[in-house]
């Protein structure tokens, strides 16, 4: 077979989750249209975070996907018209590996604890994370589309507690595979 470029990903199979939920950057802020067609551009969207740390710490590009408890229902609705995946090769994602919070504040505290434990370059605060989730939910409730980033309406679903935070990472490097 022909050689091709493949990405070396920044997270394990248990959390490699290609669904368009709310993405929060190293500051706890939403930073992009999370729609499926945008995921391939993560390296471009996260360069500014690497620049903030003078390209000295690749963990500055790490982020969280905030996921509702009923995520599997959305997968069933979206899979027929969208390039989404809950699989990595033969393995499914594992919600047991995700951070769960019964309140948004508890979720934020868990995210901060995880990022600290993993040594991420971040400045998360509970307030910033909760504010970002609340703003996203305001957009969903208003029903006027995503005025902040332009995400497609069908992907605008509420994120209410209890919910999950999935640790994510932008692709680390391009690598040559099979060649």
Residue spans of the language-model regions?
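Residues forming the flavin
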Residues: 1-131, 141-179
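Core nucleotide-handling region used for phosphoryl-transfer chemistry
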Residues: 135
